[in-house]
Amino acid sequence: MSGRAPFYVGVTHTILERERMKLGVPTMPEMLRDAGYTTGIFGKWHLGDQDPYRPDQRGFDEVFIHGAGGIGQSYAGSCGDAPGNKYFDPAILHNNTFEKTKGFCTDIFFNQAMEWMGAQKGKKPFFAYITTNAPHGPFIAPDSYKKKFIDAGMSSSTVGFYGMIENIDDNVGRLTKQLADWGIEDDTLLIFMTDNGPSASNYNGDHKGKKGSVDEGGTRVPSFWRWPGVLKPGTDVNTMANHYDLLPTFAEIAEGNPKQQNQLHGRSLVPLMKNADAPWQDRFRVFHKGRWGKGAAEKSRDNGFAVRNQRYRLVGRNTLYDMEQDPSQKNNVIDEHPELAKKMNAAYDQWYDGALPNMVNEDAPLTGHNTFHLMFWKQYDMEVPPVRVRKPRAPKKNRKKK
């Protein structure tokens, strides 16, 4: 959303008010709206549920979202979805009013997005951000998407996981067909990507790690780009890129003017879109798992980080992998490349030093009720229950055995 690394916009956790993107940060939809686009989000936001942080205040004209990081989630503080929500028939916040929907969540988000896109046809160009809750756990899919995986003898969680993915695949297919039927597919860049590696214990390309890990398996994601007549089908680009390269890329395509350009971490990918082998200056990209305890930002500097360039991945201070020769991360080659490891560690420290003053949510007080709960209760004239006090968990060594 910002063209910057999460820590640099205040996001160091997924809950506890630390999921909020700090106010005043220019966003991608704001830039596109200023460039003449209309903007819509359909699905997951997860950058703050309170009013000043919600997407209608961050550049989106059309907003159709669930709360928190997943449908039905609820945590201490403002982060939470509408009470009682499930993957089927969820209550969705549509331009600050809840709508009780019917169907499976992914189908609902795509249907709403396509209805909105159809209404924009012949008007302004549009930016549609479709962020599905699936395949987030719990792994629940429509029955029609589970049968073949059940017949294959898979476990119930794997059945749900793959069923959710196949449902997404079908919805993307519906979207591409609709763009063609509207006659705008040649004018539309369609991007499919995910936000992290898989959380389920399934095939991961022989990469080490999964969601929550700073290893390749936790951070490497698919990135498929489709633009008939502009991008050559079947082209593989092997150059490393990041999610925060999207904002400067969209700025170049849409002739937008990103504000605070000197603070962007991303780089326009347009040269690689034109030529997969275009010259490209190597760079260090930093990953950190975050999610430390309250007040522990500084001492968590070395707790779960990695630095990546085109060929090598430094994991922690003393482990270096050659990702070209060893994509499964089995052989530590730091003794063979001490100077490179030194540079990567120095780059990381510089990055973390710059991130610390931007971690503005570390001491934010927790609200009494989830924001979406309060909005839901008010809209439906429901009584607001007393605040449930969540006691802090005891340190592991002090927990009583059951």
Regions picked out by a protein language model, each given a short descriptive name:
Residues M1-G316, M323-A346, Q350, M359-V360, ...:
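Formylglycine-dependent sulfatase
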